[in-house]
């Protein structure tokens, strides 16, 4: 019998959408998309029936109601149905459209034609089962932070090719590879991208090829910071990390080991209420928070070595 999937449809207030994306990603959903429905948002997500039972969906419904209560909005409506594998592979894609992020990026689904004219940096993306489509506030904040950070590099550090000379970045928890590709399109010379999920590593490789990025510039690997310590010849110039706050806190000492005095970092996946705990852990390990950007209940920390 072919594998089947749960298709979830969540009708919610727009203010709850980012929180729902985070909850779904943490729950293990494979592929998410959203669209406007009048004054509401309709979020679609997909879960394998091999990993998820009806009781799990009931628990998810309860957590979503609790999240709405914390935010102070009305409870979302959650419905689900079974669909075949073939339907899952294509159904969510019809709801995902090109999206401008920041001043320079355009996220373009790989199955749609490229725009005929645009001055933006186009990231072609097929996330598959990996996290990172550009829909989530944390991904947007990270791309905008990269845009700001790499635009600040002095022109003397930029070669004739447009690449920032010797600028090496680590992408920890790379997901679809969207942040790695964004950094490379902005001119970084090389990105080491790691993720504990082999499907995410494969997604990063595939999306790198979609964007004509050579394997010498984008180096994905299975694992975490411990793998980077073996791959890197020297400390990195920058770090991007868009994962859950408690994981960031656990990894900060290891990340400090791959940094040098001039290294900067961008951290997101952090709820506003978690920002102090992350900032405290950073300061205890020789980092200082330069700026905190927020979008709804999420934030992004731009930091540097102290």
Curated annotation (Swiss-Prot):
It catalyses: L-lysyl-[protein] + 3 S-adenosyl-L-methionine = N(6),N(6),N(6)-trimethyl-L-lysyl-[protein] + 3 S-adenosyl-L-homocysteine + 3 H(+). One of its GO terms (cellular component) is cytoplasm. Keywords: Cytoplasm, Methyltransferase, S-adenosyl-L-methionine, Transferase. Its EC number is 2.1.1.-. It is found in: Cytoplasm. It holds the Pfam family PrmA. One of its GO terms (molecular function) is protein-lysine N-methyltransferase activity. S-adenosyl-L-methionine binds at residues 139, 173, 195, 242. It comes from the Bacteria. Its main location: cytoplasm. The keyword Hydrolase does not apply. One of its GO terms (biological process) is methylation. Belongs to the methyltransferase superfamily. PrmA family. Methylates ribosomal protein L11. This is Ribosomal protein L11 methyltransferase. The lineage of its organism: Bacteria, Bacillati, Cyanobacteriota, Cyanophyceae, Nostocales. The gene is prmA.
């Amino acid at each position: 019998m072919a594998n089947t999937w749960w298709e979830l449809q969540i009708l919610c207030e727009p203010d709850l959408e980012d929180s729902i994306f985070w909850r779904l990603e943490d729950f293990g959903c494979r592929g998410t998309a959203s669209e406007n429905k009048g004054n509401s948002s309709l979020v679609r997500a997909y879960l394998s029936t091999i990993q998820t039972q009806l009781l799990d969906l009931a628990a998810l419904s309860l957590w979503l109601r609790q999240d709405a209560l914390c935010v102070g909005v009305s409870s979302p409506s959650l419905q689900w149905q079974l669909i075949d594998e073939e339907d899952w592979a294509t159904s969510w894609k019809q709801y995902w459209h090109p999206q401008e992020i920041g001043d320079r990026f355009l996220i373009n689904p790989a199955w749609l034609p490229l725009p005929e004219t645009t001055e933006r940096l186009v990231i072609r993306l097929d996330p598959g089962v990996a996290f990172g489509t550009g829909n989530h506030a944390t991904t947007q904040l990270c791309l905008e932070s990269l845009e700001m950070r790499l635009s600040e590099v002095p022109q003397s550090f930029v070669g004739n090719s447009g690449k920032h000379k010797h600028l090496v970045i680590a992408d920890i928890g790379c997901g679809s590879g969207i942040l790695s590709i964004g950094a490379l399109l902005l001119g970084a010379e090389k990105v080491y991208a790691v993720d504990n999920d082999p499907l995410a590593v494969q997604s990063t490789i595939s999306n790198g090829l979609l964007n004509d990025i050579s394997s010498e510039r984008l180096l994905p690997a299975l694992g975490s910071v411990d793998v980077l310590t073996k791959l890197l010849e020297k400390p990195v110039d920058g770090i991007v990390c868009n994962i859950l706050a408690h994981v960031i806190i656990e990894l900060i000492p290891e990340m400090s080991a791959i940094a040098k005095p001039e290294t900067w970092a961008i951290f997101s996946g952090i709820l506003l209420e978690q920002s102090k705990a992350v900032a405290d852990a950073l300061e205890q390990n020789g980092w200082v928070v330069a700026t905190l950007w927020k979008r709804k209940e999420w934030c992004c920390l731009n930091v540097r070595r102290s």
